[in-house]
Amino acid sequence: MIPRYTLPEMGAIWSEATRFRLFVEVEVAVVRARARRGLVPADDLAAIEDAPVPAPERVHLLDAELHHDVIAFLTAYGEGVGEAARHVHYGMTSSDLLDTTLALQLTRACDLLARRLDRLVGALRDRALEHRDTLCLGRTHGVAAEPTTFGLKLAGHAFAFDRDRRRLAAARDAVAVGTISGAVGTYANLPAEIEAEVLKELGLAPEPAPTQVVARDRHAELLAALAVAGADVERLATEVRHLQRTEVREAEEPFAEGQKGSSAMPHKRNPIVAERLVGMARLLRGYAVAGLEDVALWHERDISHSAVERVALPDACCVLDYALERAHWLVAGLRVSPERMRANLEASGGLAGSSAALLALVDAGWARENAYLAVQRAAMAAWEGKGGFRDLLLAEPGVAEALAVPDLDAALDPARFVAGAGPVFERLEALR
């Protein structure tokens, strides 16, 4: 991923220096396992353990000649090992090294993303509890529906990201798998006991039925989980973008002192971070499709997946890492305007209470269809600016006789619509 969207900790996981260091860890772990069986002399093991990680520049130089990055790495590493290098990569194939190293990188990336999700869930929980009683207009199809609270809006996002945590944990388990099984996964030159020992040392499980590679449905599952998390970020960002519209102005993302919103229009305060997060989600969906394309390889393996996942896996992890960090910034610093929320609710002229008026008439003995038609006539007249919904409804034939004005006012009270939402916040308070 380009530096603009790469944060330091995630970038370090996917750096070439880290990859080569993990290459060495995997190779040394195999040599140690063979040494414990008396197959590698102690002096040779020491030489291998003490050898430096090859410099990327040397590996690149060799790769330009050899056109094989793993052989280039092993050659560069062997230069630092000396004669004991004959024990390095013994009985292994390139994918043993590549896939096991990739699993180490992916599990570390997942752990970092899990911490990001924890922070975001916590921020959403706190802001939702802060605004549990902040009344606002609920909208369906972008149109006024019924009263809700801003806390309820945020609670829904908190639970969504909690589900993302569970999906990520499952996907981490799926990719925490390596293989040290040889050219076509038959353990022809290294016994499965060595694989089990090495992978346990590295914190990985073995692929139960390896070919030459770890099955790629594992990586597809991870990319899908990252894409769903990205979609949840997009949903949150889209809500902020709509609420920041000039004619709505119920919430807006932070705008720093000295920040500029437009080269041409000095008045602009645009939701640029929220818009950027929507773009991040689009990238993640593309990477998920790429992961699915990589599942079907020829026979025991081809390398059609290689170029794809060298881009898709690091980029997807970096993109979601960035998106989650920015989403936390957005939530923690979100400027909320309860006054605008109340004003927009009142501007609906009571229309948001139409369902309560309908049920009040039904409770008064009206047939539901007759009640619906009376409420709808009053609502349509209110939409057309012919008066307030409450007064228009009371003018409908028979309504004033069926409903006392205090009872209708109580039914239309916005607070009544959210009075039963307590269990949502009880569940939210338990979210950690």
How would you name each of these model-derived features?
Residues 31-32, 105-117, 226-235, 240, ...:
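Alpha-helical support elements that line or immediately flank enzyme active sites
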Residues 33, 113, 117-120, 124-127, ...:
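Amphipathic alpha-helices that form helix-helix packing interfaces
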Residues 38, 320, 371:
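Residue-level signal for inorganic ion chemistry
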Residues 333-402, 418, 423-430:
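C-terminal alpha-helical interaction appendages
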Residues 218-250, 258-317:
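A conserved active-site cap/scaffold subdomain adjacent to cofactor or substrate pockets
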Residues 197-213:
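A short, charged helix-loop
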Residues 283-366, 374:
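Long, amphipathic alpha-helical stalk/connector segments used for oligomerization, subunit docking
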Residues 1-187, 192-197, 206, 259-262, ...:
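A helix-coil-helix interface module used to build multimeric assemblies
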